[in-house]
Amino acid sequence: MGLETEKADVQLFMDDDSYSHHSGVDYGDPEKFVDSGQDRDPHRLNSHLKVGFEDVIAEPMNMHSFDKVWICSHALFEISKYVIYKFLTVFLAIPLAFTAGILFATLSCLHIWIIMPFVKTCLMVLPSVQTIWRSVTDVIIAPLCTSIGRICSSVSLQVSHD
């Protein structure tokens, strides 16, 4: 009872002259780009999103639905996941890619032209600030702490048991 899964063996036969021998992607021919089978997540950023039917729906051994229900629900899950994803990417992928491009371009510009020069300026000025801070602590804070220490050292407590 349940869905039996088999691994299919798929082979692709191509003539030597039907594809280009260079390793780059030819963006001029959209048909080759669509069917290139390239890895669109080479750094595995979204490996956690590879969710199958068995990862979401699971029936214990003693509780099984009818085989037809299981097969139909599995098929409906996969089809709806595929169709809804394609539908959402048609409407959202280009605007979100454009927005993300603007965001990352803005952040890169701010980092390159504002943040890093500010950090480098602070690091250049820091030795001077360190010298001034050491002088301030030697002239003001050290004598103040020494005086407070001498005052507190002369305090004595006597405990009497009555």
Swiss-Prot record:
It is found in: Nucleus; Cytoplasm; Golgi apparatus membrane; Cell membrane. InterPro entries: Caveolin, Caveolin_CS. The keyword Cell membrane applies. Its main location: nucleus. Residues 1-86, 108-162 are cytoplasmic. GO terms for molecular function: D1 dopamine receptor binding; molecular adaptor activity; protein kinase binding. The modification Phosphoserine is found at S20, S23, S36. The modification Phosphotyrosine is found at Y19, Y27. Keywords: Cell membrane, Cytoplasm, Golgi apparatus, Membrane, Nucleus, Phosphoprotein. The keyword Membrane applies. Monomer or homodimer. Interacts with CAV1; the interaction forms a stable heterooligomeric complex that is required for targeting to lipid rafts and for caveolae formation. Tyrosine phosphorylated forms do not form heterooligomers with the Tyr-19-phosphorylated form existing as a monomer or dimer, and the Tyr-27-form as a monomer only. Interacts (tyrosine phosphorylated form) with the SH2 domain-containing proteins, RASA1, NCK1 and SRC. Interacts (tyrosine phosphorylated form) with INSR, the interaction (Tyr-27-phosphorylated form) is increased on insulin stimulation. Belongs to the caveolin family. May act as a scaffolding protein within caveolar membranes. Interacts directly with G-protein alpha subunits and can functionally regulate their activity. Acts as an accessory protein in conjunction with CAV1 in targeting to lipid rafts and driving caveolae formation. The Ser-36 phosphorylated form has a role in modulating mitosis in endothelial cells. Positive regulator of cellular mitogenesis of the MAPK signaling pathway. Required for the insulin-stimulated nuclear translocation and activation of MAPK1 and STAT3, and the subsequent regulation of cell cycle progression. This is Caveolin-2.
